[in-house]
Design a protein with these regions (language model features):
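Short, contiguous alpha-helical
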Residues: 1-4, 11-54, 92-147
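Residues within well-ordered alpha-helical secondary structure of globular protein domains
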Residues: 6, 30-33, 70, 81
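Acidic catalytic patch
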Residues: 10, 79-95
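Helix-adjacent hinge/juxtasegments
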Residues: 40-82
Length: 147
């Protein structure tokens, strides 16, 4: 994940302003751990491998990057299952949105964009604003897709 790769390393253990019990590391780990939860609830019965979550208090950026790659593959498999089932993803026990592929994908886009925005804002609040090319690179979707 481009943003995680480009966060200043000194931010990793920094507390979130106004939420001192939460760190940059914890926000980043939450993205992977949330994916794992959905994969477990929706994909396990369809043969999608249930992944290990990461420790939000101890995970290092390289470990998280590897985990995010695996959980990305799991979410893609859930989308493929939904497409193969006529546009309907498997239902989760406490799902808070309709179980069509469009809503499922939009949920993940919104959830992950929210947390990426948090990471960018926290970096700025802590005086470690992302360099212009890095911030602009967040919007280079075609380039990111090729990476």
């Amino acid at each position: 994940m481009y943003l995680i790769e480009n966060l200043p390393p000194e931010l990793w253990a920094s507390a979130v302003p106004g939420v001192p019990r939460r760190t940059v590391r914890m926000i980043a780990a939450h993205i992977h751990n949330a994916r794992c939860m959905w994969i477990k609830m929706m994909g396990a019965t369809h043969g999608v491998a249930v992944l290990k979550t990461v420790d939000p208090r101890r995970v290092r950026a390289p470990e998280l990057l590897r985990a995010l790659s695996r959980s990305s593959d799991g979410i893609i498999k859930l989308l493929q299952i939904g497409i193969a089932q006529g546009g309907v993803v498997p239902r989760a026990a406490w799902q808070n949105f309709p179980n069509d592929v469009v809503h499922f994908l939009n949920y993940f886009v919104a959830h992950e964009a929210h947390h990426r925005g948090q990471l960018c804002m926290v970096a700025r609040q802590l005086g470690q604003r992302l360099p212009g090319p890095v911030a602009a690179g967040l919007w280079q979707w075609s380039k990111r897709a090729r990476e």
